[in-house]
Every structure is written in C-alpha cells, then in structure tokens.
Design a protein with these regions (language model features):
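Extracellular/periplasmic carbohydrate-active domains that bind, remodel
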Residues: 24-500
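Bacterial Sec-dependent N-terminal signal peptides
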Residues: 1-30
Length: 500
C-alpha cells in the first residue's frame, strides 16, 4: 500500500479508536461497594458518592452502581451524564441530621424560589441524568415530620410567630432577605426552615427516573423544577398517610416543566399523589414559566389527598395535560384543580379519559378558583386565575362521598368544561356555581341524597342524556336555580328536572 494511502488510514484508525475510548468512558460503571462504601448502613458514604460522581462527570459520565446492601448518605448532587443505579436489594438510606443538607442551594419550595437546605438528591443545570434500578431510596423522614408537627404547634401557641430562631432558621432568614412573599403565604414561611424535597432537579434537561422504590420522603418526593424532557416510569412511592402521617409528602410534582411523561407508577402518600404546578403568586408570575405538555397514564393512586391535582401553585400556568388509564382507590379526591385570587395563571387544554375511582373519601371532581375563602372580589388582572377548556370522559366510580363541584369567582367564572360517558355512584351529587359553558353528555350520577346535578349562578348549561339510575322520591335529579341562564336540555326525563 502506498504511503499516500497508509497515512489517511492510520489517521482514520486513530480517530475510530478515540471514539471507542470515549464511548467506553461514557459508559463506565463505578461499583460503590468495591470503592469502599459501607454496605451495612453504619458509616456515611456521602463524601465517597459525591466524589465518585465528580470523577465520573469529569470523564464524560458514567453509572454510580449500588449492589445489594444498605448505604447511609446525605445529599447527593448529580451531574450531567450520570446514572444512579440501585440493584434489587440495594437501599440508599438518607441521613436525618438536618445539618447534613448544608450548604443551602437554589431550589423551588412550594412554588417559591429560595435558598434552603439541599434536596436529598439534587442537580442544577445538568443534562442526561438518570435514577434507575430495582432498589430502594429511603428518605428516613420521621424526624423531619415530627419537627414539622412540633414547629406548627410552637407557632400556633405563640400567636403565629416563632419565639426564637435556631441556627438553621437564622441561616435561612439571612439567605433570603430579598424574598418577595405574599401576605397569604407568610404564615407558611414562618417556620424559617423547610423540609427538603426528596428529589429536585432544577433547570435540567433529559431526566429519567424509572423502576426504583421511594419511601419516607421528608417532603415532596419527586419534584423537578424548570426542567425539559422528564420521564418518570414504573416508580413506586410509599409515604405513610397515618401512624405517623408524613405531612406534605406528595408523590410526583413537576413544577414549571415541559414535556413530562409519567407512566406505570404506584403511589400511596400523605398528600397529593401527582400534582402539576408552576409557581406561587408574584414569584411564580415573575418566572412566568408554565407546566406544559404533560402526560399521565397507567398509574394507580391509593391513599393521598388527591389522585391528580393541578395547583394551587399555578401562577405560571398549566397547559396541555392528558391524564388517562388511571385508578384512584382510597384517595380523598380524584381529579382536583385548585387556585385562588392572587395566584394568576391560566389552566387550559386539559383532557381526562378512562379513569376508575373507588372509595373516594371526598369529591371525585373539584374545580375550585375560590381556594382562599377569605379573598374578596377584585378587578381582573394578572392576579386573576383562569380555568378553561377542560374535558373529562369515560369515568366510572363507586363508594364515593360526593361527585364534586365547580366553584368559580365572580370576576372569572370557570368556563368550557365537559363531562361525557360517566357512570358514578356517590352519597351526594355534583354542584356547579359561577361557571359558563358547562356540558354533560351521557352522564349517570346516582346519589343517596339531594339532586344529582345542582346549578347556581351559571350561564350556558347543556344537558344531554343525564340521569340517575335510582331517582330519589320527591327529589329532582337536576336542580337549576333561577339565577342560571341559557340552559339547553335534550334526551332527559323532564319529570326529574326542577327549574326554579
């Protein structure tokens, strides 16, 4: 072979070898037990884990692998191109020493961006981050929960104020002097120290959380904020709802995220199972980033305040959400949308389909713009929340307390809601108040007391083939108050309708 041919081939070979070496480096696995991590859960592995992540990231990425065993750690800071992999039988147990989550990091806590204790697993501005495997992440939350209950009690006993601040509370005050806080939210922030979310990826892209089991979260469990392209698949979340209850231990709460897919998850928690959020009040409007392009499918929700919830922190807006093929069994509510004056934000283009509900302790459906019952009527502005273009279909339910309600506000009625192909049995029916353009098509609401459908202060009601399988004697199935305008009724039994 001539020299002129050999030289390019040599350079090509070197180039190919370089690419192969880069691929190998990218896929390198770091076995934490072989690297010296204590698999008996006695000695903290925090420093070793984070040092290994830094090393892997400096080499282009890799997998941080935990074989069978129990590993004690505090905050883990993920980097780009890092996979945290827990083998079946591996338990990553997090410290319950509050100081272990210093220094403060930037995070969004209950819809407000602040400096606070680090989430248990955290990343900032990272790309391609994965948590995977059949192992268990244990947040060891009991001490955090007891602190929360004790702090609430102290604040209540001292007229809504903390009498003194401890070290961490004073650090929080010093770190957040410029934080803008609405009057409505000030009582919540009086704690001056805040339980960290279990997992918060902040301003990250290409996130995957799959197959792991997550238990005993100190606060919200999976809480990506300002992220794009998030996949959460096959995850089991168990936070106790009693004996003792883990307060505010929501399951999955994307906040101001885009392109989120949640599927095949099992969730039983001490608050809402899945909640879609986008910031609180002025702080949320300042960032102005909606939570949008969200799919939730094939999930089972057991104990929890709500099955799938939107709000109440939704000041940046929530748009284009599809919820399908889910079971709610034993939650307090099924589908719940909540907001209040002062929030602002638009919730729109929501689709709910093929849902089964059972043993719902409260309402199957809630659409509530009047979450703050003390608020007063005000001119429409950026502070005014909006619910519109929301459609629900193919829902069945039994053993339900109330079918639910719509509650708009005088200056902004809830608008453009439809309910179709439903068969629900409950103790009490459905009430709509301060709403426009509400449609029911092929809906059976069977109740034990009162009307199945009750409308007040509404404009534009369309009823097609609505009924009760067991009408109550001397009780209308549909009650329409005199302040309701523009009602269209077809294919209904007129003897079961009362128009006042």
């Amino acid at each position: 072979i001539s020299k002129n041919i050999r030289q390019p081939m040599k350079r090509l070979s070197i180039f190919i070898v370089g690419i192969m070496m880069a691929v190998v480096a990218m896929s390198r696995t770091f076995d934490m037990k072989q690297l010296g991590a204590d698999a008996k859960g006695i000695k903290s592995c925090t420093e070793l884990i984070n040092r290994t992540i830094e090393k892997a990231a400096s080499e282009g990425g890799g997998t941080i692998y935990f074989p069978v065993g129990t590993y004690l750690t505090a905050t883990i800071h993920m980097k780009s191109n890092i996979t945290l992999y827990l083998e079946s039988g591996a338990v990553l147990r997090f410290s319950d020493k509050f100081e272990d989550y210093l220094p403060f990091v930037t995070l969004r806590w209950e819809g407000t961006v602040m400096k606070s204790l680090s989430p248990l697993i955290y990343a900032h501005s990272a790309d391609n981050v994965t948590i995977s495997g059949r192992g268990t992440l244990d947040g060891n939350g009991l001490k955090w929960w007891l602190w929360e209950f004790d702090t609430r009690k102290v604040i209540k006993e001292n007229g809504g104020k903390l009498p003194t601040l401890d070290k961490l509370q004073q650090m929080w005050v010093d770190a957040n002097k410029d934080l803008e806080i609405s009057d409505y939210y000030k009582p919540s922030l009086e704690r001056r120290m805040f339980r960290p979310p279990f997992i918060q990826f902040y301003e990250c892209t290409n996130i995957l959380i799959e197959n792991v089991k997550i238990i005993n979260s100190p606060f919200w469990t999976i809480n990506p904020a300002f992220c794009d392209n998030v996949t959460i698949h096959g995850v089991t979340i168990n936070n106790p709802s009693s004996n003792p209850k883990g307060p505010n231990t929501d399951g999955i709460n994307p906040s101001s995220c885009r392109n989120v897919r949640i599927s095949d998850c099992f969730i039983s928690v001490g608050d809402d199972c899945i909640t879609i959020k986008s910031g609180r009040d002025a702080d949320g409007r300042k960032y102005g980033k909606a939570c949008e392009n969200i799919t939730i499918t094939n999930c089972i929700m057991l104990s929890g305040h709500g099955g799938v919830v939107i709000g109440s922190e939704m000041s940046g807006g929530v748009k284009r959400v599809a919820i399908s093929n889910c079971v709610f069994d034993g939650t307090n509510a099924g589908i719940r949308l909540k907001a209040s004056r002062g929030r602002g934000g638009v919730v729109e283009d929501i689709r709910v389909d093929n849902i089964v509900m059972k043993n719902i302790q409260g309402d199957a459906f809630i659409f509530d713009l009047f979450y703050d019952r003390l608020s007063k009527v005000e001119p429409v502005s950026e502070r005014t929340p909006i619910f519109r273009n929301i459609h629900l279909s193919n829902v069945t339910g039994n053993d339900i307390k109330r079918i639910g309600y719509i509650k708009g506000i005088e200056e902004m009625p809830v608008s453009e809601l439809s309910f179709s192909n439903m068969n629900i049995v409950a103790e009490q029916g459905f009430k709509a108040e301060t709403a426009t353009d509400i449609r029911f098509n092929n809906v059976s609401f069977t109740v034990g007391e009162g009307p199945s459908f009750d409308f007040r202060q509404c404009n534009g009601i369309f009823l097609n083939d609505v009924r009760s399988k067991k009408p109550i004697t001397n009780q209308p199935v549909v009650n329409i108050e005199k302040d309701v305008e523009n009602v269209n009724i077809i294919h209904c039994d007129s003897t079961q309708i009362m128009r006042k």
